[in-house]
């Protein structure tokens, strides 16, 4: 067995062990045991690795799918927990740094904005934005609105009304960004005419966790978004044990032209795919045997690896705010 195969096997074994430990937890709500296991999981998954999760055996694939579901549930509970903590402050937006992964959202949103500005024809100066799968902590919308798109209006969609109620409370004291944020409880499958109003649509990584679900969402967006509108899809090519992977060719088949694909090798966990709805691209047409167009990955320089800093920062904040929770 060569060194690369040994590395892959060692990682899969480690992830399998963590999955087994996480699956045995009585609850996925934030606690020292939950925090420690998921910190170990992120620590194992984020560094660059030769593993290709699409080529794993059936047993490992089943484990991975179960792990993604556990990650989704734990992420939802973690975000709800911190959303409630933040809502206790007079101005919650002043305390977003409490969340241990906030820096990841800052870096991911910056990357997405830079990719949009670089690759979307005509730019995105004053867009109407939809974020699908915004959750109880809509950090991405906030960072984009506050730092990159000061004139944009954001409509945030989530299936969970409780998540939207939590999210809206975070903006109650802010007269700028708060005035540009709206929250809607809806299934993306039920959005039709609404989608045509947006210049940019963001699709969160956990919308359509199963491959077949994601395969339904993207053609639906392609059928109802306006010509020329941009689509930002979060995937996880290099971190496929944490989030579902989206094939850029599936986006092409869904009625879009793929403009850029970026797989960061630093502390940004998600991959990013930038596409746009072209009047010459329709989901039901299949030029060259495909629906839509896929031009291949556009090389994007990733920022320098700050993985060690990220792990240290997350560990420090978890310890700091575990103690602080007594006050709430």
Curated annotation (Swiss-Prot):
Q: Spell out the molecular function terms from Gene Ontology.
A: nicotianamine synthase activity
User: For this protein, what reaction is catalysed?
Assistant: 3 S-adenosyl-L-methionine = nicotianamine + 3 S-methyl-5'-thioadenosine + 3 H(+)
Q: Which Pfam families match?
A: NAS
EC number(s) for this protein?
2.5.1.43
What GO terms describe the biological role, i.e. biological process, of this protein? nicotianamine biosynthetic process
- Keyword line: S-adenosyl-L-methionine, Transferase
User: What is the main EC category here?
Assistant: transferase
Do the record's keywords include S-adenosyl-L-methionine?
A: yes
Q: Name the domain of life this protein comes from.
A: Eukaryota
Q: Which family does it belong to?
A: Belongs to the nicotianamine synthase (NAS)-like family.
What does this protein do, in the record's words?
Synthesizes nicotianamine, a polyamine that is the first intermediate in the synthesis of the phytosiderophores of the mugineic acid type found in gramineae which serves as a sensor for the physiological iron status within the plant, and/or might be involved in the transport of iron.
Record's PANTHER family?
A: NICOTIANAMINE SYNTHASE, NICOTIANAMINE SYNTHASE 3
Q: What is this protein called?
A: Probable nicotianamine synthase 6
Source organism per entry reads Hordeum vulgare (Barley)
């Amino acid at each position: 067995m060569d060194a690369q195969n040994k590395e892959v096997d060692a990682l899969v074994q480690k992830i399998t062990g963590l999955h087994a430990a996480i699956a045995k937890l009585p609850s996925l709500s934030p606690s020292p045991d939950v925090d420690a296991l998921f910190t170990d999981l992120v620590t194992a998954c984020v560094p660059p690795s030769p593993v290709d999760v699409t080529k794993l055996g059936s047993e490992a694939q089943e484990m991975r799918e179960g792990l993604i579901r556990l990650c989704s549930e734990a992420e939802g509970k973690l975000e709800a927990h911190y959303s409630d903590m933040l809502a206790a402050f007079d101005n919650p937006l002043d305390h977003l740094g409490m969340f241990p992964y906030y820096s990841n959202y800052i870096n991911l949103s910056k990357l997405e904005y830079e990719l949009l500005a670089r690759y979307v024809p005509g730019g995105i100066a004053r867009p109407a934005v939809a974020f699908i799968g915004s959750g109880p902590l809509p950090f991405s919308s906030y960072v984009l609105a506050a730092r990159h798109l000061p004139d944009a209006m954001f409509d945030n969609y989530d299936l969970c009304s409780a998540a939207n109620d939590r999210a809206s409370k975070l903006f109650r004291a802010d007269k700028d960004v708060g005035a540009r944020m709206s929250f809607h409880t809806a299934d993306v499958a039920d959005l039709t005419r609404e989608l045509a109003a947006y210049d940019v649509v963001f699709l969160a990584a956990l919308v359509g966790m199963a491959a077949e679900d994601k395969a339904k969402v993207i053609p639906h967006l392609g059928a109802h978004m306006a010509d020329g509108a941009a689509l930002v899809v979060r995937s996880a090519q290099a971190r496929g044990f944490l989030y579902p992977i989206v094939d850029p060719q599936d986006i092409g088949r869904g009625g879009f032209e793929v403009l850029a694909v970026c797989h960061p090798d630093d502390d940004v966990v998600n991959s990013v795919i930038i596409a746009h709805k072209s009047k010459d691209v329709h989901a039901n047409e299949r030029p060259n045997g495909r629906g839509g167009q896929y031009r291949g990955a556009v090389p994007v320089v990733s920022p320098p690896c700050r993985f060690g800093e990220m792990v240290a920062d997350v560990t420090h904040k978890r310890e700091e705010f575990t103690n602080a929770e007594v006050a709430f």
